[in-house]
Amino acid sequence: YNPVQRKLRVYSSITLRVIEVEGDSENKLSEGSIARMTPELNDAFSRRFINSQSISSRYDYIEEHGKIVVITDPIYDVALAPFIQWKIEKGIETEVVYADDIGGINAIKNFLEDQYYNEGLTHVIIAGDEDQVPSELVSNSGGTGYCDPCYSYIEGNDSYPEFFVGRLLTHNVSEMESVVERHLDYAKNP
């Protein structure tokens, strides 16, 4: 999906060429990160990796939901309050932080890395647009765009996330109130 052009490309057939590289190319998860793996993350991995069962048979999962960090702008405090309260009522540790208090893209990435290794971070919700909470601008064959998931590429040199990242993309308080209301309606009455 290209959010700038608002186009979704669906491929019915794709050809890949695998190129072997020189040197050590293993990209293993550290033992500590596997011990923090939640059932939700294991489910995502099982859809990506053929040998994901070998990981789940060797390590126990944490029983808690993990921790959510919401990165936002202070203008959304009131609009996000019902969403934050709902997560807390569901027993999910939830912390709200402001992008301006953390700093730029690298500071946010460092903050999230620290949360991942030391606080059990499993989910990040970015609330607001790129002007309020910045994301890395990346280029690939499809063009250039913002990469929220790049915040979750902590271990190794791959593009597989260590935690989930999502964005409540809104440009003003009214839009955020609407998004939160719809989210809660669905969460409470699916």
What are these regions (language model features)?
Residues Y1-P190:
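Cysteine-dependent hydrolase recognition
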